[in-house]
């Protein structure tokens, strides 16, 4: 019988400090998350310096709690995994330095994990029988991609944003209509009270005919222009209609391109990953389109959509099998790309 691989994973790329113990990439023994949302809400967005300081305060306790919840000793671990990018450099360094210290002190291999790969791997935890190849729509505050997962750790990017990520556009529009941070959940909630067909916000058009790329900066500008025009005319702004119409434009763009990619790649499974995968409109719309096209749609749980260390532990397991380890010179790479 093969030995179980137990990995302690650490995630600190933005405003969540998280540690988890994951067995064989799919079984989560613990997944402790310390969120800073309440702190950053006052500032209307994540303040990098504040995020780094809060990570420093939380990380020891979070790691200790993850080990305790897993009912395990440090010596039983097979490896230490950590997010090294993309993300905020100061925030990444906190998790990275802590993981390096553990790796050195315990004499356990260190595994540097790409945060985007972690989001994709959250689906392996939720869906125990999911195996490549499949298509994955990765959509979060910092990233928007359509990825063909050829094998574990092997990816082909089929479409990506050329400017703002979808989650970034949500945050900016939420700020403009006075909802504050975090924009995604607040727009999702308000949109339920609005008419999604009330305002026609345009979708980006590209010169290249067959591209599956995204662009959200023009859509964001259209919303801002609409708000300015209404204010100049001194007309009342229905915030729920703005939220619903904006959300429909984003979700339709995401789902249309993903379905086109599925046809090109002839896949019968699409996984969705990243913070925006928690969005109720995106979930409903892509499931309906999946049913029409006979494609199975997979999501992680809401907890696994947002930043967490369990997904990092899952991705790390498949790197462990390839002996894809890092040395103690591993550094934070804030603009890290997904390996193609």
UniProtKB/Swiss-Prot annotation:
Q: Which GO terms describe its biological process?
A: tRNA threonylcarbamoyladenosine modification
Give the record's keywords alphabetically: Acyltransferase, Cytoplasm, Iron, Metal-binding, Transferase, tRNA processing
Per its record, the protein catalyses: L-threonylcarbamoyladenylate + adenosine(37) in tRNA = N(6)-L-threonylcarbamoyladenosine(37) in tRNA + AMP + H(+)
Q: What class of enzyme is it?
A: transferase
**Binding-site residues for substrate, renumbered to this chain:** 138-142, 171, 184, 188, 279
Free-text remark on how the cofactor is bound: Binds 1 Fe(2+) ion per subunit.
Residues that bind Fe cation: 115, 119, 307
Q: Which organism is it from?
A: Clostridium tetani (strain Massachusetts / E88)
The record's InterPro entries line, in alphabetical order, gives:
ATPase_NBD, Gcp-like_dom, KAE1/TsaD, Peptidase_M22_CS, TsaD
Q: Which GO terms describe its cellular component?
A: cytoplasm
What family is this protein classified in?
Answer: Belongs to the KAE1 / TsaD family.
| Top-level taxonomic group | Bacteria
Q: What is this protein called?
A: tRNA N6-adenosine threonylcarbamoyltransferase
Protein EC: 2.3.1.234
Q: Where in the cell is it found?
A: Cytoplasm
Requisite cofactors: Fe(2+)
What one GO molecular function would you report for this record?
A: N(6)-L-threonylcarbamoyladenine synthase activity
State its role: Required for the formation of a threonylcarbamoyl group on adenosine at position 37 (t(6)A37) in tRNAs that read codons beginning with adenine. Is involved in the transfer of the threonylcarbamoyl moiety of threonylcarbamoyl-AMP (TC-AMP) to the N6 group of A37, together with TsaE and TsaB. TsaD likely plays a direct catalytic role in this reaction.
Q: Which Pfam families match?
A: TsaD
């Amino acid at each position: 019988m093969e030995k179980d691989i137990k990995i302690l994973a650490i995630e600190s790329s933005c405003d969540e400090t998280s540690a988890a113990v994951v067995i064989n990439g799919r079984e989560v023994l613990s997944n402790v998350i310390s969120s800073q949302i309440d702190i950053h809400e006052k500032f209307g967005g994540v303040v990098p310096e504040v995020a780094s300081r809060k990570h420093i305060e939380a990380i020891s306790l979070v790691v200790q709690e993850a080990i305790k919840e897993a009912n395990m000793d440090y010596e039983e671990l097979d490896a230490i995994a950590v997010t090294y990018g993309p993300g905020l450099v100061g925030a990444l360094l906190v998790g990275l330095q802590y993981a390096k210290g553990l790796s050195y002190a315990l004499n356990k291999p260190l595994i540097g994990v790409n945060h985007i790969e972690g989001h994709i791997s959250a689906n392996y935890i939720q869906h125990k029988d999911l195996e490549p190849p499949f298509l994955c729509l990765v959509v979060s505050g910092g990233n928007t991609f359509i990825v063909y997962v050829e094998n574990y750790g092997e990816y082909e990017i089929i479409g990506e944003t050329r400017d703002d990520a979808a989650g970034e556009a949500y945050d900016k529009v939420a700020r403009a209509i006075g909802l504050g941070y975090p924009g995604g959940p607040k727009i999702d909630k308000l949109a339920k009270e609005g008419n999604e067909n009330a305002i026609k916000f345009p979708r980006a058009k590209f010169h290249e005919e067959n591209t599956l790329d995204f662009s959200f900066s023009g859509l964001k500008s259209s919303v801002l222009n609409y708000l300015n025009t209404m204010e100049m005319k001194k007309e009342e702004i229905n915030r729920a209609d703005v939220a619903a119409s904006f959300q429909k434009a984003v979700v339709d763009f995401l789902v249309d391109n993903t379905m086109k990619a599925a046809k090109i790649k002839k896949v019968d499974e699409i996984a969705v990953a990243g913070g925006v995968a928690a969005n109720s409109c995106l979930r409903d719309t892509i499931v309906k389109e999946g049913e029409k096209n006979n494609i199975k749609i997979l999501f992680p749980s809401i907890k696994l959509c947002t930043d967490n260390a369990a997904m990092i532990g899952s991705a790390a397991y498949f790197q462990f099998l390839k002996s894809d380890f890092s040395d103690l010179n591993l550094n934070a790479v804030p603009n890290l790309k997904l390996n193609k």
